[in-house]
């Protein structure tokens, strides 16, 4: 104390120097400046990151809101379309219009509508129309899937039939253009038969029907030698080769033992058949079809339970033959060797045929012309 009091100026200068020395010893001005820069930079990076995150969240929110708005708009549009479909009726297809008068579509317009409709090759199930009377429930029953092929081996129809149904019920539902042609010519023949496992099932319901199997059986009985030779020619081929490979020598060939039965008194459950085998349906003299029983199963709850609805028919959507000139109307005539046509055979509707082959007078037809029937 005495020293401080004696030399106060020296002690004051020393006390002032000590803090400055301490500061100069612990702190570097360049290091502090770099540290401050790093702090500012980190702060800016954090701010930018937060800003980008907020922008992304806002963008996602706006996108989600836009999607929700579009979904709501589509839902409203679909609901409006359904309401419009339920409310709108096409008066041209109804029997009466809004005025209460009968409306009849002209045949030309109806024909064009049939021609212009879209047709593909898929099969469509033809549901039976409203069936009058009491509904006969379907108890556990055998259901057969029967396919019908034309002479070109193209499947034209497919049926689901019950085991208790008659063969005539299937025959009456088989569609063939030959029936229409013969009926139009006034030569329709109600006769016909199914040849299934060496049995001719003849349709003799109509008094004017003929037994198509009689001349065949008569030839077999009275010309056995000739029939046997022809039968050997039929069997010559893969079957004979297989028999020789297995047995060493083919067995003697015998004619099948054909017999007849009435179609109208035969149920499907009464006949012997092989699933997947080909059988014959013949009608109108010599129009033959191939029938194949493709499947056999028991009925289940998903099947149509009304027995009166069977046989249920499946029909392929067919491509209608159009007129080769206008490409709009359905063809009604087919011409062979027509010098005015670009193709042979050529198809025409009535209007185009008359315009092309008449010069203000009778038709100039020095070539065969036939009425065309759509299959």
From Swiss-Prot:
Expressed in seedlings, apical meristems, developing leaves, roots, stipules and flowers. GO terms for molecular function: DNA binding. Induction: Transiently induced by auxin (2,4-D), with a synergistic action of auxin and cytokinin on transcript levels. Belongs to the SNAPC3/SRD2 family. It is found in: Nucleus. Its main location: nucleus. Keywords: Activator, Auxin signaling pathway, Cell cycle, Developmental protein, DNA-binding, Nucleus, Transcription, Transcription regulation. The keyword DNA repair does not apply. This is snRNA-activating protein complex subunit. Disruption phenotype: Lethal. InterPro entries: snRNA-activating_su3. Transcription activator of small-nuclear RNA genes (snRNA), which have essential roles in pre-mRNA splicing and rRNA processing. Essential protein involved in the establishment of apical meristems and organ primordia, embryogenesis, cell differentiation and cell proliferation, probably by modulating the establishment of auxin gradients. One of its GO terms (cellular component) is nucleus.
